[in-house]
């Protein structure tokens, strides 16, 4: 209704009256954007001069989980039901595709190497792997994070494992709780 009332496109560019905004300080930001502002709706207008479309950076991810109970679905609360791999596919704004596998390697050697079309990053334990995935997202700052059933399983599983087993909140810097992930009680 808002877009219709103010004749603003659902995608594209908008203008706002420059002096009629409030700049948000870093501590209060709701996103990972470099700049956030609060603008009254009456100070917004459709931009007809920019025809360029946005090319977002998109990350799609999936987790692979071990179940310690035979013929049973894994439970994040079970210590043995660990995440052993996180796969991520990145589509960069220039349309370049990058594939990364975050993997457990249960010996004392951490190393990275490339497969033909994917980079593999190995970690000694699940906590380090989840932290590596978090740091990857923080550095990349994707515009969109997508995946099959990530809201119904993957994200909640990662958060539960990290909070309960490792005592680290993977979302501390990702601000998931400020993007509608309220059911995870972060």
Segments (PLM) and residue ranges:
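The two-metal-ion catalytic cores of nucleic-acid processing enzymes
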Residues: 1-186
